[in-house]
């Protein structure tokens, strides 16, 4: 009996289609992870793809761990070479190798929420921003939203011309990014932004 015999027809189509992209749309618990793990096994065992040339990305560490276990059960030897990680873990792995191209050292640090707040407090002090009017958390949230849209400090500044309050945030954003770089640091949003850059 083959490991693929337990799959339904739609799942088999997802596993055995190797040319071009495959989009899996299905509800929770319907077997999407099963299709992905069996597809990985199929690519290695039947198509001859090297495990280190396969990447499977998930949203959570829990899902990545579960997928890694399932792939290991199906593939066995060589499964540890497959990239089964979250988006952020994948990006950090790429950045550790290539971030020097953006002017950072490869041993960069990742700032957590407390580090970010502390840095923003310093930025606000330097720029004489009244934190009773412009709270650090509000500024950091605005910066995070901008980064989610891949809007850098200069573009953010241009987009806020004429709005005094947002201009203050724009100035803080620019200074915040400079301070991060001077500290050879990234915040959580930068992990994806810098990988794209």
Please provide the spans of the model-predicted regions.
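Conserved RecA-like helicase ATPase core segment
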Residues: 3-6, 32, 36-38, 42-43
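N-terminal pre-P-loop "Q-motif" helix
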Residues: 3-19, 188-191
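Walker A/P-loop
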Residues: 20-38
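A basic/glycine-biased coupling hinge at the interface between accessory DNA-binding modules
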Residues: 19-21, 41-196
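N-terminal hydrophobic alpha-helix used for membrane targeting or insertion
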Residues: 1, 28, 176-178
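Short amphipathic alpha-helical boundary/capping segments
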Residues: 1-6, 126, 130
């Amino acid at each position: 009996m083959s490991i693929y015999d337990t799959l339904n027809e739609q799942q088999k189509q997802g596993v055995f289609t190797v040319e071009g992209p495959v989009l899996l749309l299905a509800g929770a618990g319907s077997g999407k992870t099963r299709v992905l793990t069996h597809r990985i096994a199929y690519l290695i065992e039947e198509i001859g793809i090297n495990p280190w040339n396969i990447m499977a990305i998930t949203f959570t560490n829990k899902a990545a761990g579960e997928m890694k276990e399932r792939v290991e059960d199906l593939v066995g030897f060589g499964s540890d070479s497959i990239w089964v990680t979250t988006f952020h873990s994948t990006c950090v792995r790429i950045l550790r190798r290539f971030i020097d191209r953006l002017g950072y050292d490869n041993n960069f640090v990742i700032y957590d929420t407390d580090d970010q707040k502390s840095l923003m407090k310093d930025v606000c002090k330097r720029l004489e921003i009244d934190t009773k009017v412009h709270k650090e958390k509000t500024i950091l949230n605005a910066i995070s939203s901008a980064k989610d849209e891949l809007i850098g400090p200069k573009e953010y500044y241009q987009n806020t011309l004429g709005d005094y309050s947002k201009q203050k945030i724009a100035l803080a954003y620019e200074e915040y990014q400079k301070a991060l770089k001077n500290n050879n640091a990234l915040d959580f949003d930068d992990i994806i932004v810098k990988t794209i850059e």
